[in-house]
A protein has these predicted regions:
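Amphipathic alpha-helical interface elements
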Residues: 1-154
Length: 154
């Protein structure tokens, strides 16, 4: 992620990374993902479909936060009003810090993390990966190969 000085780039890259995870959640959650045109889907459509197939817990805060992330990104991408973008980013940060269980355990109430935008993007990304089960455990290929060999008796 970019440094805190470039909040706009951080917002855009974070949005893209989270969109990739939403796509992975959808691909894991539907029987025939090849029939979906992910390239033409917008973030909010992926968000709704990912929520419909989400295998983990379904707390409202994560989906509200993702909508807020998309709103902030859209303000940045479609407008020249830096104040509106900054307000949307601040709203997103405040919301996630208030509801994210990781932030609640690590930070003191009212404490702001060192790079708040990076912090909350990491938090959203991590939540989706863990509870969305998008990184399935891979079996060790060597173990898989050895298991397929016929047993030998010495």
């Amino acid at each position: 992620m970019p440094t805190e000085q470039d909040a706009e780039l951080t917002l855009l890259k974070g949005h893209l990374l989270i969109e990739e995870i939403l796509t992975a959640v959808i691909m894991n959650g539907v029987k025939r993902p090849k029939h979906l045109d992910f390239a033409r889907m917008q973030f909010h459509q992926k968000m709704k479909l990912a929520r419909a197939v989400f295998p983990g817990e379904d707390p409202d805060w994560i989906w509200v936060a993702l909508k807020s992330l998309n709103d902030a990104r859209n303000k940045l991408a479609h407008g020249l009003d830096q104040a509106a973008t900054a307000t949307a980013v601040k709203k997103l940060i405040d919301y996630v810090l208030n509801f994210d269980p990781i932030s609640g355990e690590v930070l003191e109430r009212g404490e702001e993390p060192p790079q708040p935008l990076n912090w909350i993007l990491f938090s959203l990304y991590s939540y989706l990966i863990v509870y969305g089960d998008v990184v399935p455990p891979r079996r060790n290929q060597l173990l898989e190969h050895l298991s397929s060999l016929p047993a030998t008796h010495d």
